Regions:
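Hydrophobic, aromatic-enriched alpha-helical segments typical of multi-pass transmembrane helices
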Residues: 2-199
Length: 199
């Protein structure tokens, strides 16, 4: 799935991981949404067994599904941050590679830090929404900036950018449609799963 990019003689060949990341990051987000949904089923009907599957000793009161959902979210945001950095490197005319990579990396780090804080009890689950989802939002903003720049430079179809915007709109709906939004985003990023031709 990864391709080799041409390099100068005597240097190591760089591997383009964008095609793999464009597939993997939305699938991780989809899996997170499904696991999070299943984890929340126990609060719907009073069954105290489905979401808290045995608990993990290091996770205190967290159930195994809650821990798995958190890990999947952190991995997904990290995948989107890495994808943002890889796509930023493809930009030729707009100097957005470094700022977007830094913003995405900060967002991924913030997501991981908040998750670790919640799982260890340093940050309660009643933390403000801006704190608990801020890292993912920063990474999404960085990815959106790179996708717009790629569309402006002609490296990404405008339809893909429109589908990515639709996926953001679906994600913002209050009905927990994260898995659907991630599938729409997977379709939007499909052109990026093809290896890029050397200039």
């Amino acid at each position: 799935m990864s391709t080799r990019t041409p390099t100068l003689p005597g240097t190591r060949a760089a591997t383009d991981r964008v095609p793999l990341l464009a597939l993997l990051a939305p699938l991780l987000l989809f899996t997170h949404g499904i696991v999070d949904w299943v984890d929340g089923l126990d609060s719907l009907d009073g069954l105290r067994g489905l979401g808290g599957l045995g608990g993990v000793a290091a996770a205190r009161d967290e159930g195994a599904l809650s821990v798995a959902a958190g890990v999947l979210l952190v991995l997904s945001v990290a995948g989107f941050a890495w994808l943002t950095a890889g796509l930023g490197a493809r930009l030729r005319h707009l100097p957005l590679a470094v700022p977007t990579a830094l913003l995405a990396a900060f967002g991924a780090g913030a997501t991981a830090a908040v998750w670790v804080g919640q799982i260890t009890g340093l940050i309660g689950h009643s933390a403000p929404a801006a704190l608990s989802s801020g890292g993912g939002v920063l990474t999404a903003v960085a990815l959106a900036m790179v996708l717009v720049a790629l569309t402006v430079e002609g490296h990404l179809p405008a339809g893909s950018l429109a589908l990515a915007a639709v996926s953001v709109g679906i994600m913002l709906l209050p009905w927990g449609l994260g898995p659907l939004a991630s599938l729409v985003l997977l379709i939007a990023l499909a052109p990026l799963t093809r290896p890029v031709e050397a200039d």
